[in-house]
């Protein structure tokens, strides 16, 4: 029997809470509770990083230097060690993680750290067909000051598969939610787009969803077979700044982007 998909929510001073997928998706009548906006101005800072299960030194230093000022931190391969949970609950109002698979002590998966509570939370998992392990994704939504709702997708795509059937299957339920969402969207993470088939499928998905890709002038993203693995796509906002941090704290370099939520044109 397949294990139930859920997210674990971490909030300072409270026990961890298990969050199951909502009964109604965001676009078909999910009730949104009133919440404090994610930002109070027009700029939204986002950090995206495959943190390699915190296996290398200096990962905490990178988060402390670059993550604590971001409104959203989208981590992949985040292992819920006491150190990471402490950082998340100290600098952020809430952290939601979707366990993809359980390691000896702490589960690993995508984790979204946010400066405001999500009004919607939909955890997703897809099983790797060859290794029989899972990759996870998380769809969350946050109110913005302009009365719009921002949809955020944090994804770690399946890696080892023959062809792109499972790869496309993982994007399917995400696309169903994005295409019906009326407000701005961010989808980011480790897409494992290391083949021509995969990158073509990813770009086709982005076109169908009306998404634009964040471009980096000095592109130091982790590559496999000459193709980048990490991406940020967006809709309904403009890009003010975008950069890739070079570090040895993981086998991936973090992506930093600052959006202007009041414009749909890129400023850089």
UniProtKB/Swiss-Prot annotation:
GO terms for molecular function: catalytic activity. GO terms for cellular component: cytoplasm. Coiled coil: none annotated. It is found in: Cytoplasm. Belongs to the UPF0294 family. It comes from the Bacteria. Keywords: Cytoplasm. Pfam families: Exo_endo_phos. SUPFAM superfamilies: DNase I-like. This is UPF0294 protein ETA_26410.
